[in-house]
Amino acid sequence: HLVGSDYFGNGHCPEGWNPDYWYDMKTYLDELSDEDKVKSRDPKESYKIDFSEKFTYAYRCSERAIKYLETYKDKDFFLSVSYDEPHGPSLCPAPFNHMYDGFKFDDCPNFQDDLSKKPFMQRLWAGKKLHAAKDEINKSSDGLSLFLGCNSFVDYEIGRVLDKIKEVAPDAMVIFTSDHGDMLGAHRLFSKNAAAHKEGAN
């Protein structure tokens, strides 16, 4: 099992799970030096020439999952793999770190939503963006590029696990779930919050 007692985890493998493969964010951070712990929270690390996928949480989760599948391919098993990425700081190696440079979304009417017919909480959430020009909301940025690149990187890492499943357990049932997306300027909103807009729900 590759997730902890909650989103972050406490570094302790719960009873009933295999400690040789169990992994959470606390376990990941414990593997890092103090210097690398700081780097693991800095999006600029993605642009350094020596930044490797092996540094990322996603890569390490996939590696454990692949080893688990190789070990238990001839037995009945349950495997849960949970990734932290693309959550910020959206670390990802080349070529994903520059894959979406300069990208911006096609114009959409909801970038100009004044939220006047939405709950007051959403207008508070929008903050200064509530009265910003459309070009200030829908624009290219390093943050957007890295976030989208990290999404593609996680797709790649998930693909590595799926490829191994096809190889060693082609009859396995795969269930894919996710928690939420990012508003990315839709309805003048960013990040996530208590709203049921399709842009923020997966």
Language model features: what each stretch is:
Residues 4-24, 57-114, 168-173:
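Active-site regions of oxyanion-processing enzymes, predominantly non-cytosolic
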Residues 77-82, 147, 151-154, 158, ...:
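Beta-strand elements within well-structured catalytic alpha/beta cores of enzymes
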Residues 39-50, 125-145, 202:
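Short glycine/proline-rich turn/loop motifs
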Residues 98-136:
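Acceptor-binding helix/loop patch of EC 2.4 sugar-transfer enzymes
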Residues 56-70, 107, 133-172:
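A long, amphipathic alpha-helix that forms part
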Residues 1, 84, 181:
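Catalytic metal-binding/acid-base residues of hydrolase active sites
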Residues 89-94, 164-202:
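Histidine-centered active-site microenvironments of extracellular/periplasmic hydrolases
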Residues 1-52, 191-192:
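Catalytic-site neighborhoods of secreted/periplasmic enzymes
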